[in-house]
Amino acid sequence: MVILLTSSLTSLVRRLQLEKKDFVKYLGVLIDYELSWKNHINLICLKISRTVGILAKLRHSIPLRPLLNIYQALINPYLYYGICAWGSAPKTYLNNLLFIQKRVLRLIYFMDYKQHAVPFFLNSKVFPLSFIYFDCLCSIMWNVANNSAPENIKRAFTRISEVHSYPTRSSLNDDFYTEHSRLEKMRVGPKIWNSLPSDMRNLPKSTFRKKIRNMLFEILSKSDDYLEITEIMHQLN
C-alpha cells in the first residue's frame, strides 16, 4: 500500500488563536514552537542518564541478562514513546541520545568508551535510535494501511489509488503519500512504507513486526553502522 497529508489539520490551526510559549507539555511530550523537539530530547537525556548511573553500579554485582532487562525496562520506554513525532528532530539533538545508548551498552559489557558499539546492540537485541524510529514508523503505517490507526492519523494520509482514476504502479501497490510541503517531516512515514516489499506489507501485524525487526537487525549487522532513515531505505533496494 503507498501512502498522501490532508488540509484539515492546517485549517484547524488557522482557526485557533493560541498563546505563544517556548514549549508545552502534552501527554508527556514537550512540544516547542519550532518543532525542533530539543526540549523533549533534553528531558529524555536527563531521565535515562539517571539509569546509566544505576547500571554503572549494578554491573559489578548482577549478570548481563538482568542488566539488559533493566535497560529494556528503564531506558527503552523513553526512546520509543512518541518517537514517531520527535524522531524527525535534527541530528544534532538525536545524537545526544545515541551517545547515551552507546555509553550504557559499553558500561554493561565492561568495554572502553571508544569501543565500537554496534556489536553490543546486536548482541543485546537493542536498536540504535534511528532503527527504533524506522521500526515505529513501520508499525504506525501498517495501522494506517489497514484502517486500524486513529482517525486523526488516518486523515493525514491518502492512498495513491484514491487520487488516480486510472491504474498506476503505485496505485496497484496500494502506496500512500502526504500532501503539504510544510509537513515535510511527516512524509518519511509514507516513504518508508512505500519502500517496503509488497509481500511484507500484506502480512498480519505480528508477523509484519517480526519481519521488520529481523530485517533491521540484518541491515545493522551488514552495515555495521548507525544508518540514517534514508540509508536504511536504500538498503531495501
What are these regions (language model features)?
Residues 24-34, 48, 75, 79-86, ...:
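Short, conserved catalytic/metal-binding micro-motifs enriched in Asp/Glu and His
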Residues 84, 93-162:
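Short, charged alpha-helical motifs in flexible N/C-terminal segments and linkers
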Residues 151-188:
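Amphipathic alpha-helical
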Residues 211-237:
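C-terminal helix/juxtamembrane-tail motif
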Residues 1-22:
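Short, conserved micro-motifs composed of acidic
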